[in-house]
């Protein structure tokens, strides 16, 4: 499930593609009920909120359902394993790149306008993906979905603040968590039903086509209901920084996805090194731009803040593993064990249900480093039990064994990541908060793309090198799970660099 991205004026919200961050918007007003003296909110504002929530849910659904249709997609487009990796990575990587500038564009040209443009573009991307005759067109459609989704999503948070002033905002922001949970649980089931019933004979294409009608209705309703702004703001935009960051990440992800099938020629390694070098150039460019008094995509002072750096590392490591395991598990169940898409979706929602329960538990336990550690230990245990179960039973492993283990893993993920955003964001200054929020949400998407690329390549390499395809997929998932357990343990080690709880002063090196 993806997290709702953040503009400079928006608060942090739970991600939508990959594991959720399980947090409510950190800068939303108090959750207390509106006072009786507060003016009532008009019905049109609540209807506008529905439009915004539909956009958020569609993003969450789109990030989740494609893994269920993976085997059918490969058979239809005659693609190799890299196609599945690109189907996921193209979306998350393009969204991560777009999120760095999406919020600022809304401030410059108007949130309502950019929301509607983004929704129309997301619809066209869904339609292009559904109609794709070849793999390249499908990837282009996914890139379009990611970029335009990144343009659309940050605007919703800002518009809610104008639709629900004062104490009313808490109630509106409070609906985000439950709606994302619905997307997390309902997305895989919807995908499984569509694939099993296949009412229009579209097979995997129905997973993208299902977006079109809700998107069109949301655009029509949005034109009538979303608030009009008096004027846009005159701001500068760092196009150079945006291009550098996007190019760097593409240069890193491309060889990770394609390198195995190409035999790792020298140019793939050179591209990987070049992408890492470009990230360094991007950071230097951001520092120079900030020193010149111009707006930067990421405030350079954040990289002297221990809380922010530790949080960035934790999100990169934690989401890199957990974001990929969901997709690989779905592929193992279908391509390895021969489960139907519907049964696969039922098994995989156990993790989403666990996350939902974990979020609720995290709220009770409090936003502390200790809560994060407890959750991560449970997540590692769940992943380890899954690994041991598959290793012990091999091709005879069944849904009854995997479901409780995935529930445990999801519970740990929900508890562990619940306090993350609040601890990190309250560890930076007010001037850095907007930049930090956008950077963290982008990193969550980037880490998922990197995880899908690296663990996906390992998964398919092991599967291809094993005589029995069924055992090959089992061994591939075992290896990915083992690495993810190590990554979770590394995340636990990084917790020592975070404050004990939210709202402690930021600490700089």
Where are these predicted regions, by residue range?
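Membrane-interface helix termini in secondary transporters
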Residues: 72, 103-104, 108, 193, ...
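Extracellular/periplasmic helix-loop-helix junction of adjacent transmembrane segments
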Residues: 69-98, 137, 342, 346
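12-transmembrane solute porter fold
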Residues: 45-54, 58-61, 66-68, 278, ...
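Helix-loop-helix hairpins in multi-pass membrane proteins, especially solute transporters
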Residues: 113-240
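Cytosolic juxtamembrane N-terminal segment immediately preceding the first transmembrane helix
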Residues: 1-61, 75
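Central cavity-lining transmembrane alpha-helices of secondary-active solute carriers
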Residues: 89-103, 149-157, 161, 349-361
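Helix-breaking motifs and short loop linkers at transmembrane-helix boundaries and internal kinks
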Residues: 76-78, 110, 131-137, 338, ...
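Hydrophobic transmembrane-helix bundles of small-molecule transporters
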Residues: 197-313, 321, 339-340, 347
């Amino acid at each position: 499930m993806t997290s709702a991205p953040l503009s400079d004026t928006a608060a942090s919200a739970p991600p939508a593609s990959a594991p959720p961050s399980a947090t409510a918007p950190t800068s939303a007003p108090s959750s207390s009920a509106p006072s009786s003296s507060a003016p009532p909110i008009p019905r049109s504002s609540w209807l506008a909120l529905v439009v915004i929530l539909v956009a958020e849910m569609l993003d969450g659904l789109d990030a989740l359902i494609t893994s269920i249709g993976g085997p059918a997609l490969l058979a239809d487009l005659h693609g190799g394993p890299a196609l599945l990796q690109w189907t996921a990575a193209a979306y998350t990587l393009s969204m991560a790149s777009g999120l760095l500038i999406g919020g600022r564009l809304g401030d410059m040209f108007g949130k309502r306008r950019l929301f509607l443009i983004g929704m129309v573009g997301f619809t066209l991307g869904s339609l292009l993906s559904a109609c794709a005759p070849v793999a390249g067109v499908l990837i282009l459609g996914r890139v379009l979905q990611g970029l335009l989704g990144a343009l659309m999503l940050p605007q919703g948070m800002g518009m809610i603040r104008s639709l629900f002033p004062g104490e009313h905002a808490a109630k509106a922001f409070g609906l985000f968590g439950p709606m994302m949970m619905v997307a997390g649980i309902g997305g895989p089931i919807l995908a499984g039903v569509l694939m099993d019933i296949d009412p229009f004979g579209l097979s995997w294409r129905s997973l993208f086509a299902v977006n079109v009608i809700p998107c069109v209705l949301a655009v029509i309703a949005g034109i009538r209901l979303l608030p009009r702004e008096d004027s846009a703001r005159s701001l500068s935009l760092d196009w150079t920084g945006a291009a550098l960051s996007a190019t760097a990440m593409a240069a890193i992800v491309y060889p990770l996805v394609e390198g195995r099938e190409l035999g790792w020629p020298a140019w793939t390694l050179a591209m990987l090194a070049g992408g890492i070098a470009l990230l360094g150039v991007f950071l230097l460019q951001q520092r120079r731009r900030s020193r010149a008094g111009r707006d930067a995509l990421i405030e350079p002072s954040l990289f002297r803040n221990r809380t922010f750096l530790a949080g960035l590392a934790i999100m990169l490591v934690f989401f890199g593993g957990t974001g990929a395991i969901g997709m690989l598990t779905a592929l193992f169940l279908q391509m390895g064990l021969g489960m139907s898409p519907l049964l696969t979706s039922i098994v995989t929602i156990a993790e989403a249900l666990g996350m939902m329960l974990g979020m609720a538990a995290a709220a009770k336990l409090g936003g502390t480093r200790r809560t994060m550690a407890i959750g991560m230990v449970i997540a590692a245990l769940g992943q380890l039990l899954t690994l041991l179960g598959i290793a012990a039973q091999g091709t005879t492993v069944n849904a009854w064994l995997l479901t409780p283990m995935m529930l445990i893993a999801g519970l740990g993920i929900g508890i562990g990541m619940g306090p993350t955003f609040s601890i990190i964001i309250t560890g930076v200054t007010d001037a850095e908060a907007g930049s930090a929020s956008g950077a963290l949400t982008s990193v969550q998407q980037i880490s998922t793309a990197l995880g899908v690329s690296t663990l996906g390549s390992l998964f398919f390499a092991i599967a291809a090198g094993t005589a029995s395809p069924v055992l090959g997929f089992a061994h591939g998932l075992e290896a990915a799970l083992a690495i993810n357990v190590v990554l979770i343990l590394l995340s636990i080690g990084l917790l020592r660099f975070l404050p004990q709880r939210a709202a402690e002063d930021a600490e700089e090196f």
